[in-house]
Curated annotation (Swiss-Prot):
ADP binds at residues 153-160. Its EC number is 2.7.11.32, 2.7.4.27. The keyword Transferase applies. It comes from the Bacteria. It comes from Rhizobium leguminosarum bv. trifolii (strain WSM2304). This is Putative pyruvate, phosphate dikinase regulatory protein. InterPro entries: Kinase-pyrophosphorylase, PPDK_reg. Belongs to the pyruvate, phosphate/water dikinase regulatory protein family. PDRP subfamily. Keywords: Kinase, Nucleotide-binding, Serine/threonine-protein kinase, Transferase.
Length: 273
């Protein structure tokens, strides 16, 4: 009998780096062996303009929403929209803050990012996060020489969550989708500074994740082609040929967590440690 993993979308919204949420989400999801989260991490969400596209992304791929947003107006907007969409939302810090307020008899300051010491390491992480969010999914290709790492790979190989995980450690990371038959940005072939690495997975793994991805999508997918195993095999073959041609290392993420994938990337470039 085929042992299929059930996937679900886990949306993590933070007004800071998102480390608290990532840890909480993974600690909870580890208790459910039959289901694996597809993480969508949204750090540095501090105003309505930044939040609205996040809410649209949740609507496109419904799942569990965890957030650490101290601004009451933004937190209320998240809860209201999640109720409308019929998805669960949890303000992870609110019960803890309430307990502190009751015990200490004093209100919290509700200051964004108050848990972080304002040292050089913190500002390096924020700079890396801003860079990584600006260079997600092939955006701003002319800046790749400013990156520490450029991750490439076909759709659903964990490029974005791995990029954000690295950024939370101060590593500026860009990621680019490999689309069969579509040339990669010319700047990728002329850049000299960053480590370029390709993420791959088995055909079955990618097909499963893609099938789950389109469950909540209402448009924008050629569903049959997107999950077709023969088509995915061709995409992987194309990615492997690109990497062989340019001597870019491959990392198979099939049985790796995001942390393990990030560690494998760092191991390829010791100065990133």
């Amino acid at each position: 009998m085929e042992n299929r993993t059930n996937f679900f979308h886990l949306h993590l919204i933070s007004d800071s780096t998102g480390e608290t949420l990532i840890s909480a989400g993974r600690a909870a999801s580890a208790q459910f062996r039959s289901a694996q989260p597809i993480e969508h991490v949204y750090p540095l969400i501090r105003n309505r303009k930044q939040l609205l596209p996040v809410l649209q992304a949740i609507d496109d791929a419904p799942g569990i929403v965890l957030y650490t947003i101290v601004d009451r107006e933004l937190a209320s907007l998240i809860d209201e929209r999640c109720v409308e969409m019929g998805v669960a939302s949890v303000n992870v810090l609110e019960p803890v803050m309430n307990a502190f307020q009751i015990y200490l008899g004093a209100p919290s300051r509700r200051r964004v990012g108050a848990q972080h010491v304002m040292n050089a390491g913190y500002f390096a992480r924020i700079e890396a996060l801003n860079f990584t969010m600006d260079h997600d999914d092939g955006q701003m290709p002319d800046d790749y020489n400013d990156a520490d790492v450029v991750i490439i790979g076909i759709s659903r190989t964990s490029k974005t969550p791995t990029s954000i995980y690295l950024a939370n450690r101060g590593i500026k990371t860009a990621n680019i989708p490999i689309v069969y038959g579509v040339p990669l940005p010319e700047s990728l072939f002329t850049t000299t500074k960053p480590l370029i690495v390709c993420l791959i997975a088995t055909t079955d793994r990618i097909s499963q994740v893609r099938e789950n991805r389109i469950l909540g999508a209402t448009h924008g997918f050629d569903r049959e082609h997107y999950t077709d195993r023969a088509a995915i095999s061709e995409e992987l073959k194309y990615a492997r040929s690109l990497c062989a041609r340019h001597n870019w290392p491959l990392i198979d993420v099939t049985r790796r967590s995001i942390e393990e994938t990030a560690a494998a990337i760092v191991a390829l470039r010791p100065k990133l440690r």
